[in-house]
Amino acid sequence: MIASGADTQSDALVRQSAKVQFGDYQANGIMAAAKKLGRNPREFAQQVIEQLDLSEIAEKIEIAGPGFINLFLDKNWLAEQISLAVNDDKLGIQATETQTVVADYSSPNVAKEMHVGHLRSTIIGDAVVRTLEFLGNKVIRANHVGDWGTQFGMLIAYLEKVENESASEMELSDLEAFYRAAKEHYDSDPVFAEKARNYVVKLQSGDEYCRTMWKKLVDITMQQNQHNYDRLNVTLTEKDVMGESLYNPMLSDIVADLKQQGLAVEDEGAFVVYLDEFKNKEGEPMGVIVQKKDGGFLYTTTDIAAAKYRYETLKADRALVFSDTRQSQHMQQAWLITRKAGYVPDSFQLEHKNFGMMLGKDGKPFKTRTGGTVKLADLLDEAVERATQLIQEKSTALSAQEKAAVIEAVAIGSVKYADLSKNRTTDYVFDWDNMLSFEGNTAPYMQYAYTRIRSIFNRSELNEQDLSESPVVLSNEKERLLAIKLLQFEEAIQIVAKEGTPHVLCTYLYELAGVFSSFYEHCPILNNEDEQIKRSRLKLALLTEKTLKQGLDLLGIKTVDKM
């Protein structure tokens, strides 16, 4: 387009065609570019085509309607790409990305059990992280745990009160009971509250006893959390913890610098940054507190420090934060102050990957029957119970060991896929029946689609090595459509990496399973008398199997060979 006179800002808007009669891909940006140039769109489209050299890729290029360019891919080129992809460990996808990306996700609180509210951040973040790494990025996981604040003064003071300093022997459920009791004392006993506040000061000033107790609380919590991460097949480890305490020593200097720059001003004893970009109810610039009048700091101050640290110390090109949509304004304000203060350059990408809420069938936030918060471990236990019942009914031919593997894969996979398959920015309804169904866009359906293709090779006398030199021949439209869909895997994961939207990959995998099903129905494989066609179709099946497995792995969902 540029060679035809369009400016460098013009986008060809090449998209997959919605209907086969419009080709495989369609360039939709011609009319907008022609309008800017004051040219006839169809004439401009013709000029663009003359500048293109797609002779090896497209068998036909045509102009449609007022100026769309339709591309029909060449089947020999498609066959060649399939052959390259099926023999490649990365399915033909080149590792072209070399950015350093910090991903801040999961972020539970210390001295509390993980609950369903942590599920979305944990699994959405992990799917995006896996995808970024697959594409060649260096990813630094940052588990921004809540490991600082007044609650630690309360806990240490209460543990001391009940003469139980052996925190390392406690289960986290005990810690939660301690937390509730400590909070009751804090609210009702002024002497206890004063002691708790003193312990916070001691902790912040590095008191050895307080630091030791604090470290015990953190370690117990993270051991319990690691058990949840392992069950969820999430890649976070204790090495990825970058809690609030990491940034605490930086906060005084940041506030001092904001004051020196004239960004933070005193207001009733607190220090506030006023932002013209945000207005309060009176239409005046909104004030964002960075230091309270008692000298304490806020989450905003910590998030400014985190952004600065991720750029200066971790040398990142991009920082992603996976948290609730309700934190959107907070993140925007923290990052706006970060940029105004000059802590990061414009080239440093700060991206809030926000998500909606998990709702019950009643449309309200997901709770226990008694209205309490659902613990993540309890949710996963229930998933295993329900999957056990389902698999016992359906998989009678499996050994006990095989059955156990299927149950775990289906149970955890169902919970994760039900979430990941929804656009993260929307709320979604948590429904056991839907997520454990073998029909529709669900984990069991996708896992079963994978095992069905595995079974083809179990029945075949040919293995992957036997097929390595066999050519791919696309002799009919079903084969051709499957080949195109297989090569669109890279497009799907590029979107996930850029936008942080795993549902795009889920949709792609579900569509791929559907296209394969149609291919399998109309194109005999194992009983085909033409050996070349048989081998070619086996290669298409093999690449489909590999793509489903790799795609589900990027989502953190396990596959099994038998179901």
Swiss-Prot record:
**Enzymatic reactions:** tRNA(Arg) + L-arginine + ATP = L-arginyl-tRNA(Arg) + AMP + diphosphate
Q: Which InterPro entries match?
A: aa-tRNA-synth_I_CS (IPR001412), Arg-tRNA-ligase (IPR001278), Arg-tRNA-synth_N (IPR005148), Arg-tRNA-synth_N_sf (IPR036695), ArgRS_core (IPR035684), DALR_anticod-bd (IPR008909), Rossmann-like_a/b/a_fold (IPR014729), tRNAsynth_Ia_anticodon-bd (IPR009080)
| NCBIfam families, alphabetized | argS
Report the EC code(s) recorded for this entry. Answer: 6.1.1.19
Q: Which GO terms describe its molecular function?
A: arginine-tRNA ligase activity; ATP binding
Localization (cell): Cytoplasm
Subunit and partners:
Monomer.
Q: Does the keyword Cytoplasm apply?
A: yes
Motif 'HIGH' region positions after renumbering to this chain: 108-118
Location (main, coarse): cytoplasm
Specify the signal sequence span.
Answer: none
Gene Ontology CC annotations of this record: cytoplasm
User: This protein is called what?
Assistant: Arginine--tRNA ligase
A Pfam family this protein belongs to? DALR_1
